[in-house]
């Protein structure tokens, strides 16, 4: 159940929220939507699945569609979330936990950006998701960032901030007061102003 204010172009409710799109699935509790600003805030118990464009179900099932080599997605949870379609970003806030193919990540805030290009010449399914792009371009993690590799939990990275450039496949760790550090499987510690992980 939700309330809709057509005059002010807003909606909101306190019940469970479920949203499904080709690039993003969302479960949560309570929401506020501002259709003029193109934002949706989810108040609590947020769980999301973010797919790369190669894993878009609509593209797979259409005529001539092919299964991707690898189904690329991440799952994440947090206390609350803000979707800003105009800026093509999703922000998870509070007790964020991310599970992806090779590692777990925890942090205070995670911001996921979609690119502004339609890599396939006009991916309508991405446009209908409100992001108008072909996939995740950048991921920022802020506040008590911890990355733990799945294949060896003793390999960890600690930082105040992380920037992941998805197309380039790079992860950069930085610190405010304390340098970020990496702990190898052998227990060796590497620390520096900026670390590429």
Language-model segments: residues:
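Mature-chain termini and adjacent capping regions
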Residues: 1-197
């Amino acid at each position: 159940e939700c309330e809709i204010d057509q005059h002010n172009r807003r909606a909101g409710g306190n019940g469970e929220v479920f949203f499904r799109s080709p690039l993003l699935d969302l479960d949560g509790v309570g929401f506020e939507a501002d259709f003029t600003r193109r934002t949706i805030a989810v108040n609590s118990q947020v769980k999301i699945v973010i797919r790369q464009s190669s894993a878009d179900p609509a593209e797979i099932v259409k005529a001539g569609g092919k299964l991707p080599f690898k189904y690329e997605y991440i799952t994440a949870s947090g206390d609350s979330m803000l979707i800003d379609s105009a800026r093509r970003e999703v922000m998870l806030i509070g007790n964020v936990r991310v599970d992806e193919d090779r590692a777990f990540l925890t942090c205070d805030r995670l911001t996921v950006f979609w690119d502004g290009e339609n890599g396939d010449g006009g991916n309508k399914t991405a446009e209908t998701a409100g992001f108008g792009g072909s996939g995740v371009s950048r991921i920022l993690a802020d506040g008590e960032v911890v990355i733990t590799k799945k294949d060896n939990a003793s390999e960890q990275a600690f930082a105040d901030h992380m920037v992941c450039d998805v197309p380039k496949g790079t992860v950069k760790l930085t610190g405010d007061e304390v340098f970020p550090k990496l702990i190898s499987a052998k227990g060796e510690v590497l620390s520096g102003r900026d670390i590429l992980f």
